């Protein structure tokens, strides 16, 4: 099988290499030999490889730059991103090609960022930063998170990892997802349709769900108004999940105590945008769930796990469901 790894044109921090592939293959002894592996960066590299590649591993920027294209032998496409909403509609995907994402790559880093954000909010760090910028000395008293209620929307690898940390700190964890099946780290799980019932008792709201037609604008002005005074918000999902203006209004008015946001609409945030000056808001530049040291090695491990599943006729753990959007 010809497997091609295409690096992004402008982000060498997340490059693949032959050495990285060899290390991943050594961790998958069932892979066997006989594979031709190519690594490219330029458009010419891609054009040469895609003529014979049966599997392609790349990030979303490569898809946007080179698809649709003639890929006569392509069978498997593994995209090294978890959320593929920016690739919709998927009419660029060659017929019969199995599309996968890299969900699972981000879980460790996202979990740590999530619990860090909750601890920052509980200890009023966003407020401290606002006072620091203004040159104000003002004592602010934080509180322990044990016993506080955190509502986590989305219980995939990101939200589930945050739930694990939050439960370990003794928090009361409410999970929210389309299918309200129990989760080992949530005291209870409710369906998305029941979100309004949880918000009035939510001390911290965490958004970790994918962007789909059903979740776009999920946290609108009305739902922000359902949160209790002094609540905090964390968003590591997508900026479009939230009415940003309503969130900024609530922060500036002091109704919400703080927010930690890693995702925005648009990205990057333009100069002069109100997000830069909103009170008690921490801006993280969409890096919360990415660790350059482990990102590609974990992604390759997941790709090989899926390749072995495909080869043996089993379900692919990372197959992307276009209809559901994740």
Predicted regions: what they are:
Residues 1-55:
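N-terminal glycine-/charge-rich "phosphate-binding" loop or analogous flexible N-terminal tail
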Residues 52-129:
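Phosphate/diphosphate ligand-binding glycine-rich loop within oxidoreductases
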Residues 66-73, 90-94, 224-229, 250-255, ...:
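Short, conserved loop/helix-junction motifs that constitute active-site signature segments
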Residues 99, 230, 236-326:
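Rossmann-like dinucleotide-binding domain for NAD(H)/NADP(H)
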Residues 111-127, 168-169, 301-314:
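Oxidoreductase and adenylate-handling cofactor-binding alpha/beta cores
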Residues 128-161:
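Glycine-rich NAD(P)-binding loop of Rossmann-like domains
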Residues 168-185:
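NAD(P)-binding Rossmann-fold cofactor-contacting core
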